[in-house]
Regions:
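Carbohydrate-interacting/catalytic domains
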Residues: 1-66
């Protein structure tokens, strides 16, 4: 349902998260320190509850890593 991976170019790293489902998905980026705002977001907003991301159906995001 959720496909996630990191990308790094030089000293810049980001997390790519894709919800391939037609249902809302909860996903916890364990061990990763997320930046504040997504660089790319296919939805109107990014919802976080505690340490979990709440992804809308078919939502995709690219978030900088600290």
């Amino acid at each position: 349902q959720v496909y996630a991976y990191t990308r790094t170019l030089g000293e810049v790293s980001c997390l790519v998260v894709l919800n391939f489902s037609d249902k809302t998905a909860r996903w916890a980026p364990i061990g990763l320190s997320l930046g504040e705002q997504p660089w790319i977001n296919s939805a109107d907003q990014l919802i976080q509850e505690g340490k979990e991301l709440i992804l809308a159906p078919f939502q995709s995001i690219v978030i900088p890593l600290n």
